[in-house]
Design a protein with these regions (language model features):
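General small-molecule cofactor/ligand-binding pocket signal
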Residues: 38-40, 89-93, 142-144
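Gly/Ser-rich helix-loop-strand patches that form or flank binding pockets
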Residues: 104, 108-149
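Small/aliphatic-rich secondary-structure junction motif
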Residues: 2-53
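Acidic, proline/glycine-rich short linear motifs
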Residues: 40-69, 91
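Structural beta-alpha unit
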Residues: 1-5, 18, 76-111, 148-149
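Short, solvent-exposed amphipathic alpha-helices that sit
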Residues: 25, 62-74, 100
């Protein structure tokens, strides 16, 4: 991130309670640091050996809907105050969630993820995304636990 760029906080979202908590936390942090948010969701085609996956499912559309619902859920508490001014953009991609997050956060000021995923995209997560990004990210990483966990 260059000195003239607005700070960006990248947040991994998968629809799980933990990722929504991460997004809520990131909104508060963005308000404190005059940063914007990029909410990121990634998906894979299901991997079932010997069983074809349904070709009538639009995974990109499903991911986009999950991301939009997560942003709304996290934004409900920010109708007033400094959090209301936080700009949130979204990014949907096909690929391994950890790699997509690492790519998107290469120039970010912060990467925020939940401690547990496996929301509506359990089949897309092949391992511990939070563990992978904490070891490989080029920016600071914050891992948020779901308060109800």
């Amino acid at each position: 991130m260059s000195a003239s760029q607005e700070p960006v906080i990248v947040v991994g979202v998968d629809g799980s309670p933990s990722s929504i908590q991460a997004l809520k936390w990131a909104i508060g942090q963005a308000a404190l640091t005059s940063a914007s948010i990029e909410a990121v969701i990634a998906w894979h085609y299901p991997q079932s050996y010997g069983v074809p996956f349904p070709d009538d499912v639009n995974y990109d559309e499903l991911a986009t809907e999950t991301l939009a619902k997560s942003i709304v859920a996290a934004s409900n508490a920010r109708s007033s105050g400094p959090e209301a001014a936080v700009k949130i953009s979204s990014f949907v991609a096909e690929g391994h969630p950890a790699q997509i997050l690492l790519d998107r956060s290469a120039d970010a000021s912060l990467l925020v993820v939940g401690s547990r995923g496996h929301g509506g995209f359990a089949e897309a997560l092949l391992g511990s995304v939070s563990q992978h990004v904490v070891h490989h990210a080029l920016c600071p990483v914050v891992i948020i636990r779901d308060r109800e966990a």
